[in-house]
Structures are given as structure tokens and as C-alpha cells.
């Protein structure tokens, strides 16, 4: 794998083609489980593991699977890996598994995972496919984590609450009370609040992309960094 190729994969997975902010895939778990940091992190890590393993597995068997049964075979691979993650969560983080509920088995139908298996893993080697799964999964998990953190902060005035559900009793002290006497903001932890927060994150990303594009054009000398507006007289003559 060339360094340039790895950079392109990383840039696409984390920012340029982020599954949550650009492709808008996996919105059901993205909005349904991001009401707290621990829920978002738990689902993000589970999705990341399935994505990396499924990309690697699909890349390994791509030559042995015919076109006629390719998609069903990919779904079976993803379902088997999701079941493994589900059993691990039942064994080690059972309370968090109960909270996340149906969203863990629904990883099987997550369009992010099936999309990367079909579009990338089935056409590339194991290392490239695994790296793509890692960076795409990280991009999805980071959006989940930011969304969960913002919603928890606005909804409850805390950060990292109940992290012991994922990391054990030692994480009980990780909770940060940002606003000591905060009464809470119910909308932030409800589904409408998730839609609003996600929309704001998408708008912020688009604004950053526009600023970077303008700066790049200015440095290339195509357009001035801050073009002056032309004023038009009532006669129609431009000053």
C-alpha cells in the first residue's frame, strides 16, 4: 500500500466521505443511540469492530464468491460477526447491551458496513480493505461520540456519565458535572434533538469545507481571498 493511497483512504473515511456527515448512512443507530456518551461509544466501537472484520473477511473470500450470491454471502458474513460482537457484549457489558437493545443486532443491516464491503473490500486486498474499515469505522464512531457528548451535555449537564457500563467500576469516577445545578434540556436527549444536532454538525462541516476550498483557491491565485463586492448604480453601471 502506498502512503498516498493510505492518506486518501484516511481522508475519505474520517472527513471527505464520512459515513455520518456526508453519506448520511446508518442514521437509525446514529440518532437512536447517541443520547449519551457511553451509549454512543459502545455502539461506535461495536460497529467499528464489525466493519474492520467484515472488510477483511469479504476481501479474503471475494475470489471464491460468484456474482449471483455475492450480496447474500456478504450479509451472512456481517451477520456472523455481529452475532460474535453481541455475544461478547452480553458476556462483558451486559447492562450496556440491554440499553442498546435492538441496535446491536441491527448492525447487520447497517448500510455503512454493507456499502464498504460491496464498494471497496470486494475489490481490494486484505490490508487495504481492513484499513478502509478501520478509518470508516472511526469516522462513524467519532460522529456518534461527538453527537452523544453534545446531547448529554445539553440534556443532562454532564459528560462521561455511566462509563462504568463499558469500562467497569474503575470508570465510575470519570463523570464530569459541567453544570452543577442544571435542570436539563429534554429536547436534546429526544429524537428531534438528535436530528437538530446532526443537522448543525453537517452545516459546520460544510462551512469548514467551503472555507478550506476558498483558502486553497486563494493560495493558487485563482481568486482573491476576500473578493470585494461590486456596487451597481441605479443606472446599471458597475463601479
Curated annotation (Swiss-Prot):
GO terms for cellular component: plasma membrane. Coiled coil: none annotated. Its EC number is 7.-.-.-. It is found in: Cell inner membrane. InterPro entries: NqrDE/RnfAE (IPR003667), RnfE (IPR010968). One of its GO terms (biological process) is electron transport chain. It holds the Pfam family Rnf-Nqr. It is a multi-pass membrane protein. HAMAP family: RsxE_RnfE (MF_00478). Belongs to the NqrDE/RnfAE family. Part of a membrane-bound complex that couples electron transfer with translocation of ions across the membrane. PANTHER family: ELECTRON TRANSPORT COMPLEX PROTEIN RNFE (PTHR30586), ION-TRANSLOCATING OXIDOREDUCTASE COMPLEX SUBUNIT E (PTHR30586:SF0). The complex is composed of six subunits: RnfA, RnfB, RnfC, RnfD, RnfE and RnfG. This is Ion-translocating oxidoreductase complex subunit E. It comes from Pseudomonas paraeruginosa (strain DSM 24068 / PA7). The lineage of its organism: Bacteria, Pseudomonadati, Pseudomonadota, Gammaproteobacteria, Pseudomonadales. The gene is rnfE.
